């Protein structure tokens, strides 16, 4: 029987499946951070259980860390306790930890791929909703809760029901300057923020194949923002070339054998999906969210929509509420909306290609008066590479703040946050009310678009910036 990529990955990991019971899946990789793991380790300790496979468990610090100092005390008492607990737990249970002073420390979904922890064909979990990022490699990756974190630590397995399947095909080639962030925001704009609920999404089509691995990670990172369980891109030569030579990747003949298997990780011809969505890449322009969920998104050249234009009463009410929170009036051009802060970073857009794209816009320009702009590399290796390329100097000369790795202003769990009423052009993944700080107003954009907003003081079409 013809199978989708998701069905192949799922079936290959079923340990046990009884009639009328949820299947038990084997988990190949477990990524751990300081926020969702303390209670899970406490549970192991209370029952006298070890970590079943510490060699398949990798930990780092990211959510609570300061991006201005490596001082564990910098972000308050709760952050300090969570980080100290992670240090203690990893030492006690034999788990590898990339702590604040480790050169590989960074956002968990940046660290995993760049160290070769993430490989095609794997099941990967983490107590974090954006674990879908790793699906870019053709791995089945999804976020789990703290009780499930404990279960995986103890057993290296997890009960999981089968999801529905969705194919999202982006046909043709994207225009120059259109990034994976624009593509995924356009997709969510079409499906809505709940359009993928109950599904695992496979992204395909020429525009997806053209993306680098970093672009594919951006794409899969935001699958959760359309309600999907996970996002997938089938592995190909782009994937294999990215993985080759990385720290935890197979070497020599093992790598060749792995590629032979990875090449089978494609949806079979004739396999059927429960839902199919199609977009034309050439129609996608630079995207900016205007509301309080990622599906409330328009082209940078559009006007703020009028709630009255929504036929669905629920969407209309949602738009009215969003505009009130965001302090926006219907009908005004998006390019006239001024911003207070810019955040370039997060597990969505903090990799080297993202920083290069932002630096290209920033080079030779200055951050607009009254705007604070942060650039937060996703990991120690990303920061080191950016500095080797001189990107830090470009940003600093333009008036951006060059920070240490961490989740930073993506979420208000550390010192980087918005004040009430402040408006931010952000390369992160969520624009919910209060996500970046109580009363903060978040607009999701690509790194180049964020840099353009920083130097102009308002949203601007990067295609017009020469």
Swiss-Prot record:
Cofactor note text: Binds 1 [4Fe-4S] cluster per subunit.
This protein's pathway: Amino-acid biosynthesis; L-leucine biosynthesis; L-leucine from 3-methyl-2-oxobutanoate: step 2/4
Enzymatic reactions: (2R,3S)-3-isopropylmalate = (2S)-2-isopropylmalate
EC number(s) per entry: 4.2.1.33
Signal peptide (from-to): none
GO molecular function list: 3-isopropylmalate dehydratase activity; 4 iron, 4 sulfur cluster binding; metal ion binding
UniProt key word Lyase: yes
Keywords per UniProt: 4Fe-4S, Amino-acid biosynthesis, Branched-chain amino acid biosynthesis, Iron, Iron-sulfur, Leucine biosynthesis, Lyase, Metal-binding
Enzyme superclass (EC): lyase
UniProt record, GO biological process: L-leucine biosynthetic process
Cofactor: [4Fe-4S] cluster
Residues annotated to bind [4Fe-4S] cluster: 347, 407, 410
Pfam families per record: Aconitase
PANTHER family listed in its UniProt record: 3-ISOPROPYLMALATE DEHYDRATASE, HOMOACONITASE, MITOCHONDRIAL-RELATED
Family: Belongs to the aconitase/IPM isomerase family. LeuC type 1 subfamily.
Assembly, per entry: Heterodimer of LeuC and LeuD.
UniProt protein name: 3-isopropylmalate dehydratase large subunit
Native source organism of the sequence: Escherichia coli O9:H4 (strain HS)
Lineage: Bacteria, Pseudomonadati, Pseudomonadota, Gammaproteobacteria, Enterobacterales
Gene that produces this protein: leuC
């Amino acid at each position: 029987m013809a199978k989708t990529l998701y069905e192949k990955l799922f079936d290959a990991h079923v340990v046990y499946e009884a009639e009328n019971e949820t299947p038990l899946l084997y988990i190949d990789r477990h990524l751990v951070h300081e926020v969702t793991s303390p209670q899970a380790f406490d549970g192991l300790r209370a029952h006298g259980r070890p970590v079943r496979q510490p060699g398949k468990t990798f930990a780092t610090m990211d959510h609570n860390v300061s991006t201005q100092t490596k001082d564990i005390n910098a972000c308050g008492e709760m952050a300090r306790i969570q980080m100290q607990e992670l240090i203690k737990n990893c030492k006690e249970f034999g788990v590898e930890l990339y702590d604040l002073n480790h050169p590989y420390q960074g956002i968990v979904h940046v660290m995993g791929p760049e160290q070769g922890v993430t490989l095609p064909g794997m099941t990967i979990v983490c107590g974090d909703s954006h674990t879908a990022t790793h699906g870019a490699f053709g791995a089945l990756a999804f976020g789990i809760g703290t009780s499930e974190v404990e279960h995986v630590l103890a057993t290296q397995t997890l009960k999981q029901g089968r999801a529905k399947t969705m194919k999202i095909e982006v046909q043709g080639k994207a225009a120059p300057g259109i990034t994976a962030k624009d593509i995924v925001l356009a997709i969510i704009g079409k499906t809505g923020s709940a359009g993928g609920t109950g599904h695992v999404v496979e992204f395909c089509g020429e525009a997806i194949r053209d993306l680098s691995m970093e672009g594919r990670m951006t794409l899969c990172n935001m699958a959760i923002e359309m309600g999907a369980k996970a996002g997938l891109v089938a592995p190909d030569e782009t994937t294999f070339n990215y993985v080759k030579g990385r720290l935890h990747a197979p070497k020599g003949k093992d790598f060749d054998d792995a590629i032979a298997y990875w090449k089978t990780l494609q949806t079979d011809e004739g396999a059927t999906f429960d839902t199919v969505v199609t977009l034309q890449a050439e129609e996608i322009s630079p995207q900016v969210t205007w509301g309080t969920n990622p599906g409330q998104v328009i082209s940078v050249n559009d006007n703020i929509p009028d709630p009255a234009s929504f036929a669905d009463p629920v969407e209309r009410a949602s738009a009215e509420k969003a505009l009130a929170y965001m302090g926006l009036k219907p009908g005004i051009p998006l390019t006239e909306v001024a911003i207070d802060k810019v955040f370039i970073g997060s597990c969505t857009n903090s990799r080297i290609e993202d920083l290069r794209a932002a630096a290209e816009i920033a080079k030779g320009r200055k951050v607009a008066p009254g705007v604070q702009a942060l650039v937060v590399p996703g990991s120690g290796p990303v920061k080191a590479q950016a500095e080797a390329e001189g990107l830090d100097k470009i940003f600093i000369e333009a008036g951006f703040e060059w920070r240490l790795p961490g989740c930073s202003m993506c979420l208000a769990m550390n010192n980087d946050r918005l004040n009430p009423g402040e408006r931010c052009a952000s390369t992160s993944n969520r624009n919910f009310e209060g996500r970046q700080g109580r009363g903060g107003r978040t607009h999701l954009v690509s790194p180049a678009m964020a840099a353009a907003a920083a130097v102009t003081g308002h949203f601007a079409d990067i295609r017009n910036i020469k």
